[in-house]
């Protein structure tokens, strides 16, 4: 199951006592700030969580899986996420007891 923005807003409503509209606006505003920073070419660093980086990928050869035809894959810019040490440690600790 995935965590949604609506669930995040609901959590803010329940834990901080914000009204639902304000909680939803806070979540939307948070993600809009991240989007705008990435669109303008900035790195996003969330201490204790991780970093969102932009990475330029060069054009490379590819293949159409249906026809087998060789086709070039265009150069593009992609967003990558690198989890921070604290996040990695918490996920590892949470998953170590599940096996």
Swiss-Prot record:
One of the protein's GO biological processes: DNA recombination
InterPro entries: Hist_DNA-bd (IPR000119), Histone-like_DNA-bd_CS (IPR020816), IHF-like_DNA-bd_dom_sf (IPR010992), IHF_alpha (IPR005684)
Signal peptide as annotated in the record: none
A GO molecular-function descriptor: structural constituent of chromatin
Pfam families: Bac_DNA_binding (PF00216)
Single GO cellular component term: cytosol
Keyword terms: DNA recombination, DNA-binding, Transcription, Transcription regulation, Translation regulation
Region (Disordered): 49-71
Stored NCBIfam families: himA, PRK00285.1
Function per UniProt: This protein is one of the two subunits of integration host factor, a specific DNA-binding protein that functions in genetic recombination as well as in transcriptional and translational control.
Homology family: Belongs to the bacterial histone-like protein family.
Subunit structure: Heterodimer of an alpha and a beta chain.
Protein name (Swiss-Prot/TrEMBL): Integration host factor subunit alpha
